[in-house]
Amino acid sequence: MKAHPHMSLPALCALVSRYIVRLRVATCAASFVLPGLALADGSTPQIPGTPAGHALVAWLDAFNSGDSEKFASFAKVHAPWMGLDQEKALRASTGGYDLASIDGSDNLWIVFHAKTRVGGSRVSGSLVVRLKDPEHITLLNLVPADSKSAEIVLDEAERSRVIEASERLLAQFYVFPDVAKKTVAKLEALRKRGNYRSITDGEVFAVRLEDDLRVISGDKHFRVDYFAKEMPPFEPSSRPHPDPHKLAADNCGFEKADHLLPNIGYLKLNFFTEPAICASTAIAAMSFLADSDTLIIDLRDNHGGAPGMAALISSYLFEEPTHLDDIYDHTKDTIEQSWTFPYLPGKKLTGKTVYVLTSNQTFSTGEEFSFDLKNLKRATLVGDATGGGAHPVAPHWIDGHFVIVVPFGRFMNPITKADWEGTGVEPDIKVPAADALDEALKRAREEP
């Protein structure tokens, strides 16, 4: 993310439209003030003394400080995925933010207006913390104030309609019918209790509903998305395909293929893309690394993607056709087997030592890849346990503003029928994710 000191506010806000951070916050009931923090009109801000309020104060304090070391320390502890250069550029462009008003709040969310210290442009912000872990910010969203004013304001009828539609889709498509029934009952109880009554912001409502679905069901693959601009609904089978030009710009998720030492290959893979679009990139990367004695595959920042690409890369590691895993589809009541590819261009890496680096951010298809290679004893996993999401999903439009993503199946080992849902994939060598590469390199150097 790059910003310029004189860029327009819409362009600036586009950079941070889905800005997610993680903080450590406390809980209390009273309002409080932060020394040195003032409202845009010079008065003292009264921020609710709630988890959401504490989170807002903590972020503003770190962001507005202008102290690179302070922000680096903050990011290291609370938001290790944040790019310090990006934050520095954003801070230079805005000069920081002064609160203009607190427009609505609850324990877990807060909506506010702020002004940039450079130019005095108004932005609307919304922040949501997680229900089960209020130290974790689920959403921090900043958009131009004029664009926010054009959004719909949710009323009770709209909120109820979205929740009831979500309940119907959950009952129809969710992979575990018994869990779906219990989740629907608890969600309906929350609605009748008035848990969503004060939420009029679409983005906040979507995130709160998503969080409740995940907590009640225990399934991290649930997602609820909100679109301020009304979108034309589409069926899951006809949803837009990935943009090949954007994928090419991102190198199809292959961040780096390199030789760290003459005999140690390194592949940094951040997401799995469809082989129909990106097979040539995968083939080029694996061919480049084919002569390595040891291969390190870094999935610490891999959040998932297409299972077909995971199977393609796995195919370079096995000599014979190999049954990788099974995928159960609840909507069709079928089991689809995943095997390595029978033919591949280029050399294979059979017989070579393989390490896979994992973290708690490794998710979904990244976990499938790790799970398969571990169970087949084809790789040694190094790092932290993975995120714990083993369910493929499909989107369902509720209307032109809301879409719910429902898990409809599950990956599983073809022999044990086990998966990693909720628990993650445990590494063979457990070390902090930040130390995983050094640990793998150390062990690779010690190999005969």
Model-derived regions: residue spans:
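N-terminal secretory signal peptides that target proteins for export/translocation
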Residues: 1-22
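Bacterial N-terminal signal peptides
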Residues: 22-36
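Short, well-ordered alpha-helical segments enriched in acidic and aromatic residues
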Residues: 62-82, 183-189
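Exposed beta-sheet edge and beta->alpha loop/turn motif
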Residues: 96, 103-153
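Solvent-exposed loop/turn segments at secondary-structure junctions
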Residues: 144-147, 228-232, 271-275, 301-307, ...
